[in-house]
Amino acid sequence: MKRDASRVILALVAAIVVIAAAVEAQENPYREDGWAKFPDGRRLGQMSAIDVDRAGNVWALDRCGANSCAGSKVAPVIKFDATGKYLTSFGAGLLVFPHGMHVDKDGNVWVTDADGKDGKGHQVIKFSADGRVLLTLGKAGVPGTASDTFNRPSAVTTSPNGEIFIADGHGGESNARIVKFSKEGKFISAWGKKSSAPGEFETLHAIATDARGTSFARRPRQQPRPNI
């Protein structure tokens, strides 16, 4: 019996090795030209974020056919089905420099606006799946360090209990902190400052939470060490 069990284990290990080798041999990342299909021939600009909802739909964040949405009437938040078929888009005229996006467990779409111009930007906006604005954090066009202002927020995520975590800052003279809010948008706390020391940030670029609500903030490629 022990010998048979050992043979089964060896067979499983061998199978795992073969599968791992096959996966490793695949091109990563791979590219599929023409996946996104627009009915009006729209061309995409700089794509800053992408996420997938629970139904398998793909959400993309486009900088309005260019690298900025300032003065544009193009809708930057785009929804595709799993085959790349265009479903809807929204957010036109609301964002300056869309950067981070997060689709929460209820299907709401969160977007960060990491710049400011003409009285817009430096905000985090929560949209419903059909494009209604449900919540706005930060003061439009006003950079700052207070509990109700941001300076170039780069990313947003929500924890399993609905709490909101925002990576506030995008290099330069912007902020370098994590800001936490209740699910209703009430300020809870903020931490971090611009520094290369452990637990601090020079340039924030992405954020995520695990099942326990622990936040993970990522620096850009030049500073790959994450903070937890």
Language-model features: locations:
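N-terminal secretory signal peptides that target proteins for export/translocation
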Residues: 1-6
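Short beta-strand-initiation
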Residues: 8-9, 45
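Bacterial N-terminal signal peptides
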Residues: 9-20
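Eukaryotic scaffold repeat domains enriched in small/polar residues
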Residues: 23-228
